[in-house]
Amino acid sequence: MSSRRKFIKKAALGTVGISTVFNTITATEKKAAITNTKKVKKPVIISTWRHGLAANEEAWKQLKKGVSPLDAIVAGVGIPESDPEVRSVGYGGLPDREGKVTLDACIMDKNSDCGSVSFLQSIKHPIAVAKKVMENTPHVMLSGEGALQFALSEGFKEENLLTEKSKLAWEKWLENSKYKPIINIENHDT
């Protein structure tokens, strides 16, 4: 267990290390870094995962067509959500310990309005549902059965999102899983 004293010591050492690195950067390098950040033109699309590259590409295509940035993002995110080879989101995503593909997504517009869904099952495009939550409800988040019922009321269709590949990976995980059963088994995710 880490004590407060150890934490403060590590934080202080980290600060010294970071400041040492920054002090070794030349004035020219500092100016170049600042100058380069000012050259960035809007809009900017950033992804944190490799499968986000296809999402970025689609979002740019949509922007070039004149689609709103928000709709372009939804279209872009829809690409990995539909890809059965992407194991972290959407169709093809790895299931939870019960073998169910549960998804989440969130979105925010330029006015800081936002919408999100969590523990959503059977809906391929949670990002599109999150956008509907933002636009059509007073809520910021819908979860579980409430998110599913809302999605269905908005015209989304239920689909089996568990691909054979993900099912096999889950079954293999079950063979050696050391997951401790949760106490709260009444369909709660908290």
Could you tell me what each predicted segment is?
Residues 2, 9-12, 16-17, 31-190:
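Alpha/propeptide regions of enzymes that mature by internal proteolysis
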Residues 17-23:
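Hydrophobic h-region of N-terminal signal peptides that target proteins for export
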Residues 24-25, 57:
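Generic detector of bulky aromatic hydrophobic side chains
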